[in-house]
């Protein structure tokens, strides 16, 4: 198969909106080809779909070197993303951004994403840890802006991204090999190889297989550094918890060097995987497709930099890694019966993630740091030793997460040529996520040793098993046996989500040119969080608290926390099966009374008590209305979508849309806990049991045109979106709780304009571009978040007021082949980071801990942040970090002859840094950044 001339390729390789496709032209003619998409679960021309849809063809992705999640997000003006590294990101569309929790808790305590990610017909969304599918042998990527909930369900709140794989082709032998290599300025080399083969077997059966390996070299250096914990920082974060840091004259504070972890270009990522598909045309009316995809993403090092150190540098004290593997098996059956089209799509996703993250920065924010870090006279009452020592401050987080998802969808539709067109279906999804997250503190064994000798005498042996094992008999836990000697705290959770939904859509041609469409989705959704958080508080507070642990163990289950039983209690009280008196007598887990007697802890301890939680329920400060007697949060609702489209002519269509979207509620593991600080704005504060569903309503007007004899395609849409009860993740150890939790910050709205065009100026020159103008605003702040979140009227994070791109491509004939040159200019405007927290407070922490400024701009949002004072004695401002505007330029030139292609390219010609500050789960700022200037070569052969 020869390399296609420009505009002589398949429709899906045509130029599309948002400048996603490379610029295209043909020496023969300049008309743009039709583009076919399945954004409405029906094959339709892009220009006939009354939705803002963008598509990127497989040919275009290969020509532009678009291979990963980061690559294809970069060229979408109304799309932004944030996160730590490949496989640890979140995507946002049209400014509907929030604040996702840290990756250390996203599996156990994260919000569902607001943008759904699909691989073919299967949803693969995961909050905070997007499934980073390598773009090998894809037919196209479709990006649907605005709520798509009626057809695509939960998490299609702000939009949907669909990755459509190339299917086996019947009756044709095909193959392709692509290789490439590149070098990043100041960094390592990268390489990739991909291969595809399509084999027909008879007339009605075909097999298609693709395999790939892509290694992306690093450019960030982990530099030599020394860390010494700061007493003033520790003291102010201990507010409400203690113990305070007691800096006696003879106190020894250990420092730590990261010399063993110093390495150049240490942020590497390697994608390795394959996909096999078999298609069988059973008859003229029925076909079946089975596919299996498997991938391993292996990330080494950190993709975050410390902006105070300068460009391209981090200072981590532990090795970092993220191994993310998935297997996805899907079955699609299509048929026709009695004039009805029938489609069944089923899938099973099995994903496993193993992560290791440096957690030494927790010394700058944890509420109990002196407890874990120091021994001796750090309390008002001296300990068993007169020595005052703070030990090795290194900390690490180790995580193992498994995610299993089973989906089934059956839909039926009528003939699309009729005046009345109907589609209806049923959808079922069952998701289970298990996570074991171990927080490993190097200091704890030494800090606890004197106390263990006091309680166990000669029988005490070091190192101690600090966190023994999960509370026995608690549903949803997965750990068997003790943890390692450094594990001081760990999460052991199972999250489940089960949904059944019925959906339908009716389209009616009022006239030949005017069509009305109405769709609806009725869903029933059940979510549950089970398991336990396990502490080592028994290692100091009375040894094992009378629990009788064997020598060498110091954990006490009486200090552990069981969300399983918290939600059973809250649900039982909600349905009346638990009385006030019974609620007041609840203990932290079943059997605690038998194990610990009078020393057993109350279930809702922390900053409060069972009585305080009960009072919060009675006063309406703690909503438990959605929790049933089994501890499950139940939601059911119906969302709708209504559109009207008018085809003014064969080349112009205008449309209007009203649509709704949603994402699931989320349970909190510390549900019902009273905040530790009950003064000022925190008076009466209680951790929500459930962060309720946040809902999005969208109104949109759009136009789609093909002008100048189909040489110019111009599409635009203007929209207004309202979000109710926006979910946000929050970590406030100084005032509320040292566990991350979710809550609803308030309401928001976004308004904007999206424009894209493609213009075949001549038979050889093509221009394309896209722009997004957005205005976002928090329109209401819930009472409990006033003075904690940014004030009403503030903009949403990661939402630039302007973003755009412009591309040009020129084709010409030379040496019996086709050559081209292209360029792409991408601009993304200034944004801010976060909704809850104070940039001034984080900067002050950085100054105290490291003795220098973090080097990041701050935007004052007005007022003060309700937390402890900064070092000058005043309350910090309600402020956020600023991400500066960034402009990147990519250029390339290539040549194709017969079955061969070759291209040389330079991406990010000016080495634009494009910093985005990351604050979620952090105590001093870190930033992600763009890959610097990269020069490379690509070669391809197809047959």
Which residues are covered by each model-predicted region?
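N-terminal periplasmic accessory domains that precede
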Residues: 69, 90-92, 105, 143, ...
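Short acidic/polar hinge/loop motifs at secondary-structure boundaries
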Residues: 105-145, 195
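Transmembrane beta-barrel wall of Gram-negative outer-membrane proteins
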Residues: 185-299, 325-328, 402-408, 413-429, ...
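Structural signature of Gram-negative outer-membrane beta-barrels, strongest in the C-terminal barrel
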Residues: 279-284, 413-415, 425-429, 495-721
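Membrane-embedded beta-barrel scaffold of Gram-negative outer-membrane proteins
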Residues: 332-360, 645-671, 690-744, 749-751, ...
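Outer membrane beta-barrel strand-and-loop segments of large Gram-negative receptors
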Residues: 372, 386-409, 681-692, 698, ...
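C-terminal beta-signal and adjacent terminal beta-strands/loops
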Residues: 439-440, 444-446, 825-849, 886, ...
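Gram-negative outer-membrane beta-barrel transporters
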Residues: 512-516, 711-723, 741-837, 938-942
């Amino acid at each position: 198969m020869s390399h296609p001339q420009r505009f002589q390729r398949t429709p899906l390789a045509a130029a599309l909106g948002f400048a996603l496709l490379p610029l295209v032209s043909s020496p023969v003619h300049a008309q743009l080809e039709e583009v076919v998409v399945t954004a409405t679960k029906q094959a339709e021309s892009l220009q006939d779909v009354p939705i803002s849809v963008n598509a990127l063809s497989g040919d275009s992705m290969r020509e532009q070197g678009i291979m990963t999640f980061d690559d294809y997000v970069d060229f979408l003006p109304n799309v932004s993303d944030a996160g730590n590294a490949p496989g640890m990101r979140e995507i946002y569309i049209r400014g509907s951004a929030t604040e996702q929790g840290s990756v250390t808790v996203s599996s156990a305590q994260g919000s569902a994403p607001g943008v759904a990610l699909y691989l073919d017909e299967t949803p693969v969304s995961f909050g905070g840890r997007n499934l980073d599918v390598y773009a090998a042998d894809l037919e196209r990527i479709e990006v649907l802006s605005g709520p798509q909930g009626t057809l695509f369900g939960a998490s299609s709140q702000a939009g949907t991204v669909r990755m459509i794989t190339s299917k086996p082709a019947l009756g044709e032998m095909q193959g392709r090999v692509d290789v490439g290599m590149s070098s990043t300025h100041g960094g390592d080399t990268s390489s990739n190889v991909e291969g595809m083969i399509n084999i027909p077997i008879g007339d009605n059966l075909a097999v298609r297989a693709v395999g790939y390996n892509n290694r992306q070299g690093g450019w960030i250096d982990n530099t030599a550094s020394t860390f010494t914990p700061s007493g003033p920082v520790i003291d102010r974060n201990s507010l409400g918890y203690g113990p305070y840091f007691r800096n006696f004259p003879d106190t020894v504070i250990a420092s730590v060097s990261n010399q063993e972890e110093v390495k150049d270009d240490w942020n590497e990522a390697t994608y390795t995987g394959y996909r096999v598909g078999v298609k069988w045309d059973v008859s003229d009316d029925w076909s079946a497709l089975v596919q299996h995809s498997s991938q391993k993403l292996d990330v080494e090092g950190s993709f975050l930099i410390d902006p105070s150190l300068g460009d391209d540098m981090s200072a981590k004290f532990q090795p970092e890694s993220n191994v993310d593997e998935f297997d996805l098996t899907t079955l699609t059956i299509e048929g026709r019966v009695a004039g009805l089209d029938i489609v069944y799509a089923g899938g099973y996703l099995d994903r496993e993630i193993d992560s290791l993250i440096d957690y030494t920065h927790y010394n700058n924010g944890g509420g109990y740091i002196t407890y874990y870090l120091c021994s001796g006279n750090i309390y008002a009452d001296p300990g068993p030793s007169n020595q005052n020592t703070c030990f090795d401050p290194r900390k690490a987080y180790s995580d193992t997460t498994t995610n299993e998802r089973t989906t089934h969808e059956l839909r039926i539709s009528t003939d699309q040529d009729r005046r009345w067109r109907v589609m209806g279906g049923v959808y079922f999804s069952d998701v289970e996520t298990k996570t074991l997250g171990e927080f490993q503190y190097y200091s704890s064994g030494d800090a606890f040793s004197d106390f263990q000798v006091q309680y166990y005498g000669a029988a005490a042996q070091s190192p101690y098993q600090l966190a023994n094992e999960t509370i026995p008999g608690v549903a949803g836990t997965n750990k068997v046996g003790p943890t390692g000697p450094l594990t001081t705290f760990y999460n052991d959770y199972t999250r489940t989500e089960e949904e059944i939904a019925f959906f339908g859509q009716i389209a009616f041609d009022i006239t030949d040119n005017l069509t009305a469409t109405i769709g609806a989705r009725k869903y029933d959704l059940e979510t549950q969080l089970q398991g336990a958080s396990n502490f080592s508080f028994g290692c100091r507070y009375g040894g094992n608290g009378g629990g009788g642990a064997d020598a060498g163990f110091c954990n006490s289950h009486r200090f552990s926390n069981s969300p399983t039983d918290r939600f059973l209690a809250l649900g039982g009280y909600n349905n009346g099966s638990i009385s006030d008196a019974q609620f007041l007598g609840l203990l932290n887990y079943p059997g605690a009374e038998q194990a610990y007697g009078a020393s057993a802890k109350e279930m809702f301890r922390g900053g409060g008590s069972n009585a305080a939680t009960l009072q919060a329920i009675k006063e309406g400060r703690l909503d438990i209305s959605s929790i049933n007697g089994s501890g499950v949060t139940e939601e059911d609702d119906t969302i709708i979508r209504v559109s009207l489209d008018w085809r003014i002519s064969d080349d112009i269509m205008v449309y209007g849309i009203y649509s709704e979207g949603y994402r699931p509620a989320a349970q909190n593991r510390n549900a019902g806990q009273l905040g530790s600080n009950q003064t000022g704005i925190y008076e009466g504060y209680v951790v929500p049991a459930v962060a309720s569903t946040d809902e999005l309503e969208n109104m949109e007007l759009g136009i789609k045109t093909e002008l100048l004899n189909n040489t110019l395609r111009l599409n635009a849409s203007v929209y207004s979106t309202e979000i109710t009860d926006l979910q946000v993740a929050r970590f406030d150890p100084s005032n509320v709780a040292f566990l991350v939790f979710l809550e609803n910050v308030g309401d928001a709205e976004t308004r904007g304009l999206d424009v894209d065009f493609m213009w075949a100026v001549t038979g050889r020159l093509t221009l394309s571009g896209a722009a997004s103008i957005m205005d976002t605003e928090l329109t209401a702040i819930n009472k409990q978040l006033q003075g904690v979140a940014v004030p009403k009227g503030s903009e949403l994070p990661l939402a630039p007021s302007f973003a755009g791109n412009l591309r040009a491509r020129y084709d010409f004939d030379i040496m019996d082949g086709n050559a081209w040159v292209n360029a792409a200019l991408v601009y993304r405007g200034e944004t801010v980071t976060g909704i809850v927290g104070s940039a001034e407070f984080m900067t002050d922490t950085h100054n105290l801990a490291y003795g220098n400024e973090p080097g990041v701009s701050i935007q004052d949002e007005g007022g003060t942040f309700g937390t402890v004072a900064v070092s000058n004695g005043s309350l910090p401002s309600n402020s956020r970090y600023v991400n500066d505007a960034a402009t990147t330029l990519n250029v390339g030139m290539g040549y194709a002859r017969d079955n061969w292609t070759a291209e040389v390219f330079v991406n990010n010609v000016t080495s634009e840094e494009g910093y985005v500050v990351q604050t979620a789960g952090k105590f001093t700022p870190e930033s992600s950044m763009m890959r610097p200037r990269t020069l490379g070569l690509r070669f391809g052969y197809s047959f």
